[in-house]
């Protein structure tokens, strides 16, 4: 969504005329380093699940899906930084056909990162709900075949939606659709949490007998969701302000923080793997085995 994702430069030009807020710029090198770190961390998560059979369960497949989403967000920024660098060196034209196509592909990756994160978190939330309240039927309800089918549907939808949003990014309905997915996801998970809370109160004794791992997974989801909201909400607000009030002095003050909001998104990809590792003993054991194996080579 080039006129939105990359709109800060144009908007900030008018912002200086309507607002006293200075544009907050961050060095591209910082974005690049954080993005590289995010790619490597999430790649380690994915490799750990692929190489360890004791991690090949639905919950970890959904975590892999979230890791792929985070990795796409980091790759987006890496490729964008490289494109900007070559453009500044004069190798690319500002509005050439190759540059425009490349820009569309990069923007699609960014949208895939957001959509993939949203639906992966939804899948994890539903998985945790079934784990807690249908523990005895969990393995018959959440099978590997169904997990793969759900993930295939999620990513097919995300790819189709991402391409569509980039093609029609200059239309306001597209922007509204893009931004509405974020609050809709929050409302759905909030309703799920309220239902889980009410069910927990009426089934307190049964829940207290559940394995600690089941509740640990629910707490991990809560932490992941909190980090996701904290890191993405400022950028979603940025998109709305750029679309509906780009010349308002108060809006332009917030829009001037574009780089800070972008930095938060990059940080999300770095923070999530630490949450997985800190909350999951199985992943920590897998990491130790991978490190021991690499030392033996």
From Swiss-Prot:
Record note on quaternary structure: Homodimer. Interacts with corticotropin (ACTH). Interacts with MRAP; this interaction targets MC2R to the plasma membrane. Interacts with MRAP2; competing with MRAP for binding to MC2R and impairing the binding of corticotropin (ACTH).
Listed transmembrane segments: 24-49, 59-79, 105-126, 148-168, 181-199, 218-244, 257-278
Lipid-modified sites (S-palmitoyl cysteine): 296
Cleavable signal peptide: none
Any one Gene Ontology molecular-function term assigned to this protein's record: corticotropin receptor activity
UniProt cross-references to PANTHER family, sorted A to Z: G-PROTEIN COUPLED RECEPTOR
Intervals, Extracellular compartment: 1-23, 80-104, 169-180, 245-256
Membrane topology: Multi-pass membrane protein
Primary location class: membrane
Post-translational modification summary for this protein: Ubiquitinated by MGRN1 that may be involved in post-endocytic trafficking and/or degradation of internalized receptor.
Localization per record: Cell membrane
GO cellular component: plasma membrane
Similarity-based family: Belongs to the G-protein coupled receptor 1 family.
Disulfide pairings: 21-253, 245-251
Keywords: Cell membrane, Disulfide bond, G-protein coupled receptor, Glycoprotein, Lipoprotein, Membrane, Palmitate, Receptor, Transducer, Transmembrane, Transmembrane helix, Ubl conjugation
Protein name: Adrenocorticotropic hormone receptor
Residues in the Cytoplasmic compartment per record: 50-58, 127-147, 200-217, 279-297
Pfam families: 7tm_1 (PF00001)
Protein task: Hormone receptor primarily expressed in adrenal cortex that plays a key role in regulating adrenocortical function. Upon corticotropin (ACTH) binding, facilitates the release of adrenal glucocorticoids, including cortisol and corticosterone. In addition, MC2R is required for fetal and neonatal adrenal gland development. Mechanistically, activates adenylate cyclase (cAMP), the MAPK cascade as well as the cAMP-dependent protein kinase A pathway leading to steroidogenic factor 1/NR5A1-mediated transcriptional activation.
């Amino acid at each position: 969504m080039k006129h939105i994702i990359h709109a800060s430069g144009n908007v900030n030009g008018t912002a200086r005329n309507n607002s006293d807020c200075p544009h907050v710029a961050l060095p591209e090198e910082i974005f690049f380093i954080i993005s590289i770190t995010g790619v490597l961390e999430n790649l380690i998560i994915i490799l750990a699940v692929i190489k360890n059979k004791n991690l090949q369960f639905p919950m970890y497949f959904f975590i892999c899906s979230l890791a792929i989403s985070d990795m796409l967000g980091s790759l987006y920024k890496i490729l964008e930084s490289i494109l900007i660098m070559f453009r500044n060196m004069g190798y690319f034209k500002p509005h050439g056909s190759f540059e425009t196509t490349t820009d569309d592909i990069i923007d699609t990756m960014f949208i895939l990162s957001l959509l993939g994160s949203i639906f992966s978190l939804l899948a994890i939330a539903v998985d945790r709900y079934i784990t807690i309240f249908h523990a005895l039927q969990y393995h018959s309800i959440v099978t590997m075949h169904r997990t793969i089918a759900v993930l295939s549907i999620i990513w097919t939808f995300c790819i189709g939606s991402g391409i569509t949003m980039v093609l029609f990014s200059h239309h306001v309905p597209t922007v509204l659709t893009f931004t509405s997915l974020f609050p809709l996801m929050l409302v759905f998970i909030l309703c799920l949490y309220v239902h889980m809370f009410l069910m927990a109160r009426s089934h307190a004794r049964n829940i207290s007998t559940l394995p600690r791992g089941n509740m640990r997974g629910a707490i991990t989801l809560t932490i992941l969701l909190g980090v996701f909201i904290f890191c993405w909400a400022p950028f979603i607000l940025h998109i709305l302000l750029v679309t509906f009030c780009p010349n308002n002095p108060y809006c332009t003050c917030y829009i001037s923080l574009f780089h800070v909001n972008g930095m938060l998104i990059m940080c999300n990809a770095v923070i999530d793997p630490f949450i997985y590792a800190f909350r999951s003993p199985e992943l920590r054991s897998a990491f130790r085995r991978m490190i021991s194996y690499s030392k033996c080579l």
